[in-house]
């Protein structure tokens, strides 16, 4: 049954993507897309012919597959549908980092100006996000009495729902949401739908990508977004059920995913694109906020 739920989630990911785009279209007064638009786009990309430059190495072939495997593993290891998994939270983020490294290597291997530009900006953003991510991991470990596995952390947060712990969890949710936007190249840190050289990050790395590889990388990015949403649900919004074991709970999980995606759509609609060199101000503030909250928690 758990495997069935996982496969269903994989098939629903393009629908989640269309849902996010349609909410933004409604808020911007534009025409909505078909529910199956993402499926059509991916099928069209897979039907295109492939082109391999003579200047690229095996990295260009390997990187999209590694990205897909790390995204699937990241989604698979978050135990919303697997009762027996007991994954270390540090290992989880290392798997995510492996995919980011191969994406940058892929951009550099294409030997184009835009690939180098996108890879450099990606490394800059990841270097700024990394300290906040490390503190979020440390914060969860401290809250769970130095337990590093996701199940122990979630169980602790369910059994210790005091006002103080709830406040600290809210701070963690804000930081996790910022990490979600930055890691998935969403507003205000990147615009996934732009091709403007001055602002694009993710699109710059994929600008020279031929169609089948582009389809794999697009699928990987959509899986990553839902995996982060799952992580946010599991760690922060998991106050009633932490394992999906029935169709009712699966429906509750879908409702939570759609709620978070709706919030992402509202946030992206009413906020402007941030300049690259202002990212450090946002994550510097979040870093200081985490340090202050951790200090208060340890001293209380």
Regions found by a protein language model. Give the residues of each.
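Transmembrane alpha-helical segments that form the membrane-embedded catalytic/substrate-channel core
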Residues: 14-23, 100-107, 173-191, 261-270
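Cytosolic juxtamembrane amphipathic/interface segments immediately preceding
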Residues: 41-59, 113-117, 206-212
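Interfacial loop-to-transmembrane junctions
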Residues: 263-290
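Alpha-helical transmembrane segments of helical membrane proteins, especially in multi-pass transport
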Residues: 203-206, 210-248, 256-265
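Juxtamembrane boundary at the C-terminal end of a transmembrane helix
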Residues: 292-300
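Juxtamembrane inter-helical linkers in multi-pass membrane proteins
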Residues: 25-46, 190-212
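Alpha-helical transmembrane segments
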Residues: 2-13, 85-97, 130, 161-183, ...
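Juxtamembrane/interfacial segments at transmembrane-helix boundaries in multi-pass membrane proteins
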Residues: 137-171
């Amino acid at each position: 049954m758990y495997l069935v739920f996982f496969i269903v989630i994989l098939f629903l990911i393009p629908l989640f993507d269309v849902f996010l785009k349609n909410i933004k279209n409604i808020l911007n007064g534009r025409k909505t897309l078909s529910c199956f638009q993402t499926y059509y786009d991916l099928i069209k990309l897979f039907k295109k012919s492939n082109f391999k430059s003579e200047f690229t190495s095996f990295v260009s072939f390997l990187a999209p597959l590694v990205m897909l495997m790390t995204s699937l593993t990241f989604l698979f290891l978050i135990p919303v549908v697997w009762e027996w998994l007991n994954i270390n939270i540090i290992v989880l983020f290392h798997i995510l980092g492996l995919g980011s490294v191969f994406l940058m290597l892929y951009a550099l291997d294409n030997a184009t100006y835009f690939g180098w530009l996108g890879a450099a900006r990606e490394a800059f953003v990841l270097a700024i996000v990394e300290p906040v991510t490390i503190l979020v991991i440390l914060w969860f470990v401290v809250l769970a009495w130095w337990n590093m596995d996701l199940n122990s952390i979630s169980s602790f947060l369910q059994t210790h729902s005091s006002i103080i712990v709830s406040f600290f969890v809210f701070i963690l949710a804000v930081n996790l949401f910022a990490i979600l936007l930055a890691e998935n190249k969403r507003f205000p840190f990147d615009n996934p739908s732009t091709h403007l050289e001055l602002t694009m990050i993710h699109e710059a790395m994929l600008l020279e990508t031929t169609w089948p590889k582009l389809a794999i990388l697009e699928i990987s990015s959509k899986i990553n977004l839902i995996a982060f949403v799952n992580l946010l649900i599991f760690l922060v919004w998991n106050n009633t059920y932490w394992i999906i074991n029935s169709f009712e709970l699966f429906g509750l999980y879908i409702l939570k995913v759609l709620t978070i995606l709706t919030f992402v759509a509202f946030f992206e609609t009413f906020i402007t694109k941030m300049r690259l060199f202002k990212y450090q101000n946002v994550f510097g503030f979040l870093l200081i906020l985490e340090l202050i909250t951790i200090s208060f928690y340890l001293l209380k």
